[in-house]
A protein has these predicted regions:
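Gly/Gly-Pro- and Ser/Thr-rich, intrinsically disordered tail segments characteristic of DNA damage-repair
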Residues: 75-76, 110-124
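Alpha-helix capping and helix-loop boundary segments enriched in small/acidic/polar residues
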Residues: 39, 117-121, 140, 224
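Surface-exposed amphipathic alpha-helical tracts and adjacent flexible/coil segments at the periphery
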Residues: 1-10, 15-21, 26-29, 33, ...
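Short glycine-biased active-site loop of nucleotidyltransferases that positions the nucleotide triphosphate
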Residues: 105
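Glycine-rich, positively charged N-terminal anion/phosphate-binding segment
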Residues: 37-56
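Alpha-helix capping/helix-boundary segments
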Residues: 99-100
Length: 409
C-alpha cells in the first residue's frame, strides 16, 4: 500500500503551525506574489523561513505555490522571486504555467516541482508529459472521477505522485479557469485576485423586457451550477487510497486556524485509523462526521469522484455557510494551572461553556472561570477581537490547544 500524505493549507505563519501540530504531513503556502490567493495573508520570506524551519523540526514538508498563469510582464519577477526562494528552501514548488516551470527548473534545479490543478490535468498523457519534463507530482483536475484517477495511476511510473483535492470548496469553472471575476470586477482569478462572483445572487433579464428581473432559482426541471457545495470525502478514505492517490489535499489557504485544525485532525485520525484497521475506521465514522461539522462549511458533496454531480451538488439559497462552532482563539501560553493566554477572535463571557480542542483528538468541555486583560484586570466578557487575554479554564490546557464555542443555532 502506498503511503498517504495529508496536505493542509496555510495562509499565515500561525495557521501553518496549527496545521503542523494538528496532523499535517505537508503544508502548502503562498508567498507575497504569484500564488493565486491575493486575499490570503500570505508569507513574507522571513515568515517562510520560520515556517519551514518549524515544519521541518516536526518532520513536515512545505510546498510553495507559484501557480499563476503568467503574462509577459510577470516573468522577470518570477525569476527574481525564485532566486529569493533559494535561501528559503521549500520542499517543492506548485506550478501551472510551462514558462514558470522552465524558470523554476533553471533557478531551483534541486527543488521538486509539482503541477497545479490549474494546468487541467485530466488524462495520463498529461501526467506522462509532465513526468518527462521533470515534475515529481501532478495535482489532478477536480473534474476527474476515482475510476479515471485509478486508470492514470496504472499508466504512469510508480514513483510519480498523484495529488487530489479531497475536501473544501470547488470552483464552478473547469479546473478553476474562470473569467467572471475579470469581467465583473477587473480582478483576475488566474492571477490570484478572484472576487468569487460565482457566490453572488443573480437575476435574468430578457433583452426585450428591460427592467423585468427574474431571479435564478431551482425547480424540478432545472439544474444550476453557480454555487457549488464543498467536497467532503471523509466517508471515502478507502476508495481514495485504492485509486492510488498519494496526497490528500485540503482546500483553503484563506481559512481560519479553527477550520485548519478541525479538518487536519479529523482526516489525520481517519487515515491513521484506516491504516491500522479498516474496522476501526468504520467504527469511528460518526466521530469524523461530527468533528468536520464543527468548522464553518457549505453543505457537502462528493464532487466528481463518483461521476458527474447533479443538482444535489449545488446550493440554491442565499445562506450558503453552515456554522456550528465559533473560533475563540488558540492557546499561546499555558501556566500549568488551568490558565492560558490567547489572542481573542470572537466574543465569549465568564460562565459560558466552551470546548478545548486538543491535537490528540480529545475535546474537553469547560466553563470559563475568569477573564483578565494583559495587566491583570478582570472583565466579564471578551468583546474586542485581537485582545490579548488570560483565561482561567480550571482544566488541562496546553499551548496550541484551540478554544471554540458552540453556536446557538
Amino acid at each position: 500500500m502506498r503511503k498517504t500524505e495529508l496536505l493542509i493549507p496555510a495562509g499565515s505563519l500561525d495557521v501553518l503551525k496549527t496545521a503542523v501540530i494538528y496532523g499535517a504531513d505537508a503544508v502548502y503556502i503562498g508567498g507575497e506574489a504569484f500564488g493565486l490567493r491575493a486575499k490570503a495573508h500570505n508569507f513574507s520570506l522571513e515568515d517562510m523561513k520560520e515556517g519551514i524551519a518549524f515544519a521541518h523540526a516536526h518532520d513536515v514538508t512545505v510546498y510553495v505555490t507559484a501557480n499563476i498563469l503568467a503574462h509577459n510582464q510577470d516573468l522577470p519577477g518570477v525569476e527574481a522571486y525564485f532566486e529569493e526562494l533559494k535561501e528559503v528552501g521549500p520542499d517543492a514548488l506548485i506550478i501551472s504555467d510551462p514558462g514558470v516551470f522552465e524558470i523554476a527548473k533553471r533557478v531551483l534545479p534541486d527543488t521538486e516541482l509539482h503541477i497545479s490543478t490549474q494546468a487541467n490535468n485530466t488524462n495520463y498523457g498529461t501526467y506522462l508529459f509532465w513526468n518527462r519534463m521533470g515534475a515529481k507530482r501532478v495535482v489532478s483536475a477536480r473534474e476527474l472521477s476515482l475510476a479515471e484517477i485509478k486508470e492514470i495511476r496504472a499508466h504512469i511510473p510508480d514513483d510519480m505522485e498523484i495529488e487530489s483535492f479531497i475536501h473544501g470548496a470547488m470552483c464552478i469553472s473547469y479546473s478553476g479557469r474562470c473569467l467572471l471575476s475579470n469581467f465583473f470586477t477587473g480582478r483576475d482569478a488566474n492571477q490570484g485576485a478572484c472576487t468569487h462572483p460565482c457566490r453572488w445572487k443573480y437575476s435574468i433579464v430578457e433583452e426585450t423586457r428591460p427592467g423585468e428581473y427574474m431571479p435564478v432559482y431551482e425547480n424540478e426541471r432545472g439544474t444550476y451550477i453557480f454555487n457549488s457545495k464543498d467536497v467532503c470525502m471523509i466517508e471515502h478514505v478507502p476508495e481514495l487510497i485504492d485509486a492510488g492517490i498519494d496526497s490528500f489535499k485540503i482546500e483553503g489557504r484563506m481559512k481560519t486556524a479553527l477550520y485548519v485544525a478541525t479538518v487536519a485532525r479529523t482526516y489525520r485520525k481517519a487515515i491513521d485509523d484506516y491504516m491500522k484497521d479498516p474496522k476501526l475506521y468504520e467504527a469511528n465514522m460518526e466521530w469524523y462526521k461530527e468533528e468536520i461539522g464543527k468548522c464553518t462549511y457549505r453543505e457537502f458533496t462528493t464532487g466528481f469522484y463518483f461521476g458527474k454531480p447533479g443538482s444535489d451538488a449545488q446550493i440554491y439559497n442565499s445562506n450558503t455557510y453552515v456554522k456550528n462552532y465559533t473560533y475563540l482563539g488558540t492557546v499561546e501560553e499555558a501556566d500549568g494551572k488551568g490558565r492560558c493566554r490567547i489572542e481573542q477572535k470572537n466574543k465569549f463571557s465568564v460562565g459560558e461553556t466552551i470546548e478545548i480542542m486538543k491535537p490528540d483528538g480529545r475535546n474537553l468541555e469547560v466553563v470559563v472561570k475568569s477573564i483578565c486583560d494583559e495587566d491583570g484586570n478582570e472583565q466579564e466578557s471578551a468583546p474586542h477581537p485581537k485582545q490579548i487575554l488570560w483565561v482561567d479554564l480550571g482544566a488541562d490546557v496546553d499551548k496550541y490547544d484551540i478554544l471554540r464555542k458552540k453556536e446557538d443555532n
